[in-house]
Amino acid sequence: MEFAQLVDDPLKHVCRVLVVGCYVDGFRGRFFDDLDEALGGGLSSIYEQREFTGELNKVKLLNTFGKLPAERLLLVGLGNNEELNSDRLRQAAGAAATALRPVGVRKLSSILHLARDRGAETLTATVEGFALGSYSFDEYKTGKEPKTDLEEATLLFAEAGDLDYNVNKVLAETATICDAVRFARDLVSQPGNVLVPSYLAEKGREIAARYGLSCTVLEREEMAQNSMNALLAVAKGSHEPPKFIILEYRGGGEDDAVTVLVGKGVTFDSGGISLKPREGMEKMKDDMAGAAAVMGTMMAVAALKLSQNVVGLIPAAENLPGGGAYKPGDIVRSMSGQTIEIVNTDAEGRLLLCDALYFAQRYKPAALIDIATLTGACVIALGNFATGLMGNDEGLTRSLKRAGEVSGERVWELPLWDEYGELMESDIADMKNAGGPSGASISAGWFLHKFVGKTAWAHLDIAGTSWEEKGRPYRPKGATGVGVRLLVEYLRGLK
């Protein structure tokens, strides 16, 4: 999707649709009275007749019948003026994009971003809402009508004084990040018979070639040479070979710090021998959403040319039952040398991650962040509205919380007390791979922290935020691409 800025009077601007933000509390907002007058009191009449109230995310499409150069106005509810923030504005823009899809509008103009005098922050939220709210995935539908998704949005500025910051830079950077989110959504949306580990590796090579990253893919033999036995154990039940994808971006100096991102890449999770219930298993194609987030983040970091050194590690495998599958009761020696008793083959993501986290130590990272659809328990604890956060470094977790608030991809920190380690104790190995239902999200995080040494580390559990069952304004039903905006915001905040 493309974005442009234009200094023009909204009352004189020629366009198919002009998006206008409206409130519920009597606060008219900028340009409301002028537009109302041009329409002969039409906007006031709509409010009086309760056809539209300004309620958050509610929309009303009006034909101007030639009274304005804009053919139609799309009124978008912003709720109460005093409660308007960036995420509400992001939602409103997403609601506008969603409402225009069935109408077949490919281009719009907007003064929605002028509803709140916050400069770049407001513009960013508006652009994100339009770009992410207009997303759809219909690659496999046959006999479909041509797509009518939004392709272009013009952000109007009534006067040069509104341009007290580099608008074009904000538009370009925000569009770049949203492209990366859409890329991640596309990956997660692919069916499991298409997106296998080798497909994910090929996508890594493609973005590396396009954006100037280096890409290395370790095959099964090289993983064995590196003693990645936990990862390889998970892959044993599938005919699809596992892949270990390494993406490197060197935007900083040779001696500058390195941030390593690790994304869980279970391209389909049946649970293995500890088979999942039939109901909902088709959604287990999204168990590589962490890998998609890391790949999308690496794409955005390179496109933005950040002055950082960033490495993305993606352990990719399928978890299936089969004649060679790993079994409950097996003991696996991880790359770190620590032994793991397998009590549940459906607790497989942490086995991929533990070898990847240990491998990451080779880069001597200043910060190590893993992101994974790790536990159903996190969905129970936080629902679909926040990503679970754990870590061993207060500065790192604080930075991720800040990035979550700015990006709208909020996180909530859970404790990582030693007592949770008692749940993972094994009689015959160094630890078990699962500790039962009590505190399951935290015990999973505790398991991971055993493989990071003294490195500053954080774990993001996106099991609840990677997929939308019903859809929300800028997060349509399906894959959300969560993690990309959060991680990019974190990386942009590094000194």
Curated annotation (Swiss-Prot):
Protein's GO biological process:
proteolysis
Residues noted as binding Mn(2+) 2 in the record, renumbered to the chain: K264, D269, D287, E348
Domain of life, per UniProt, equals Bacteria
Cellular localisation? Cytoplasm
Its cofactor is: Mn(2+)
Q: What residues form the catalytic site here?
A: K276, R350
Where, in this chain's numbering, is Mn(2+) 1 bound?
D269, D346, E348
Alphabetized UniProt keyword annotations: Aminopeptidase, Cytoplasm, Hydrolase, Manganese, Metal-binding, Protease
* GO MF entries: manganese ion binding; metalloaminopeptidase activity
* Function text: Presumably involved in the processing and regular turnover of intracellular proteins. Catalyzes the removal of unsubstituted N-terminal amino acids from various peptides.
Against HAMAP family, the record matches this protein to: Cytosol_peptidase_M17
Name this polypeptide is given? Probable cytosol aminopeptidase
**What is the source species?**
Geotalea uraniireducens (strain Rf4) (Geobacter uraniireducens)
